[in-house]
Design a protein with these regions (language model features):
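Short amphipathic alpha-helices and their capping/turn segments at secondary-structure boundaries
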Residues: 1-4, 31-45, 84-100
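Residues lining hydrophobic/aromatic ligand-binding pockets adjacent to catalytic sites
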Residues: 2-7, 18-30, 114, 118-121, ...
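A structural signal for short, well-ordered beta-strand segments and their strand-loop junctions
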Residues: 10, 46-50, 98-105, 161-166
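Extended cationic-aromatic binding surfaces that line active-site or macromolecule-binding grooves
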Residues: 14
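Short catalytic/ligand-binding loop motif for oxyanion handling, primarily in non-cytosolic enzymes
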Residues: 18-19, 56-58, 108-114, 171-174
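Short, surface-exposed acidic-centric catalytic microdomains
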Residues: 27-69
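Divalent-metal-activated hydrolytic enzyme cores
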Residues: 59-67, 71-94, 127-194
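Internal, conserved structured core segments that host functional sites
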Residues: 98-122, 134, 148-149
Length: 194
């Protein structure tokens, strides 16, 4: 066994394949390219799990909020999709790889990390558009898939930082810079590798 820091990361499918993303979140191929280049350069193995929205409703779907996905059928669908990626995580950890994190998509009702208060649409259900001034006491939840993934990792005592990539933010935005700082801190905890 090598003493090198061998790393893996769990990543939402749309960050590798932007075509899976619902249209309002945009495709942003340059951002996916930048993320994949960084992970490959740092020799981080990528475990990509299937997009639960695409596999449940296809590519031509309307944007929805977390409320619509929060049901027993969709949660079960997510659990099924995570079976193989979780087996891979277990096998890598068993073989002394370090799980450096999970990367989800900001404002995703399934893979996001911070789903707060959202506007209500004309059907009186939650829309994918966040409220500009949320109530201070409004709970912030994870997206459905991220929540289930967190539960599965916790069951086994595996901790991994959950990061959220702000795909709609400009490259120089504070949110985007904070994402990169967090990712680098988790991938390179001992400083720049030689």
């Amino acid at each position: 066994m090598s003493k090198k820091d061998r790393k893996i990361i769990l990543i939402a499918q749309c960050l590798v394949n932007p075509y899976c993303r619902v249209h309002i979140l945009g495709q942003n191929f340059p951002l996916s390219h930048e993320l994949m280049n960084y992970l490959m350069e740092k020799r981080v193995g990528i475990i990509q799990y299937p997009c639960p929205e695409t596999t449940a409703m296809g590519l031509k779907r309307n944007p929805q909020g977390r409320q619509q996905y929060y049901n027993i059928f969709f949660r079960n669908h997510c659990k099924e999709l995570l079976k193989v990626p979780m087996l891979m995580v277990r096998e890598f950890i068993r073989s002394n790889y370090r799980l450096v994190g999970y990367i989800g998509l900001e404002n995703s009702p399934t893979c996001g990390i911070h789903w707060g208060e959202h506007n209500v649409n004309r059907y009186n259900t939650e829309s994918p558009n966040p409220v500009e001034q949320p109530e201070p006491n409004e709970p912030v939840l994870m997206g459905i898939m991220a929540e289930i993934l967190s539960e599965e990792l916790n069951k086994e005592g595996n901790y991994a930082p959950f990061l959220e990539l702000p795909v709609k933010e400009p490259a120089e935005s504070a949110k985007r810079k904070m994402f990169w700082e967090e990712l680098i801190k988790n991938v390179e905890p001992y400083g720049k590798e030689v």
